[in-house]
Amino acid sequence: MNQRFSLAYCLALTFAWAAGAQAGGGPENLFLVVNALSPDSVAVANAYADLRGIPPINVLMLPWRESTESVSIATFRSDLLDPVLKAIDGRRLAPQINCVVYSSDFPWRIDFAEELPAALKTQELHKFPSGSLTGMTMLYGAVRSGQGPVWLDPQSNRYWRPLDSQGVPKSTDGFQGWHRYGSQGEVTEDSGNRYLLSVMLGVTAGRGNSVPEIVRGLEASAAADGTQPPGTIYFVTNEDVRTKTRSPAFPPIVRAIEDLGVKAEVVSGVLPTARRDVAGLMMGTADFDWPASKSTILPGAICENLTSLGGIFTPSAGQTPLSAFIRAGAAGSSGTVIEPYA
């Protein structure tokens, strides 16, 4: 996929990054947004703020009265994104904020049909023009630009690292929200795009998780920080197109992980079977039953299932949602809220 409008749903920093805080920094580098009208949102945020030591000045209590599933981009821009960014600026936190963390009971899908050019509206690719809350927050500059849906450009995320011939990033670069990134991902002084990492602590509506499930995950992830538990990162391959198209890149990625002193393995099947050391996972299947695998997800693990509807929490959506990983003990996961670019 060249571009995915995916919902990052993490326990560690989020329900992930805030967990170990390497990618986005420490508690002073994130901004926590809470739906002040939702007891679930407040409960999840309180648990997270306590576990992570979030300063009160880095918390915004926002009374969200709109849908907690989907809203128009105009509503997102005026009633959610702009108030968040204005609060960050008003509190003089902009130089230090790298990540916007949403608690539960905010919309996970942003509908931008009203801003789609007429020439694109007839294309099957844009039949359901939507982006995720976290993806559209990361691309806040494009969303606020007034230049049309420039976020549709597959190259809109310039923080993405270019890959070498083996499919492994050529280099890595610690993220800073005040950095500007050029067309090749290079940090520039006065040109290029700025971004903000963004995650959700959880979704408590529809096919999401319960508040106790989310809080248990937050607690387990916090307890795992810095412990470097022994475990294995698994890459699952089978005849499903979701894995076949990516499996050639698995061996070099496994080697790169092992060069860091972490075990990694390519396994065949739908899920890792009877593995008690799942420290990370990449797989691809429409539906799965994790308990039936008899495998154990370790605290702090990031688990990904590359499929079309994993980030959709509408009860009738179909396909297994990413919340199944959280329920099984994963620290974080992500999923698309609309069919991604292939």
Label each region the model flagged:
Residues 5-6, 141:
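Generic early N-terminus positional signal peaking at residue ~5-7
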Residues 23-342:
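Cysteine-dependent hydrolase recognition
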Residues 6-18:
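Bacterial N-terminal signal peptides
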Residues 1-3:
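N-terminal secretory signal peptides that target proteins for export/translocation
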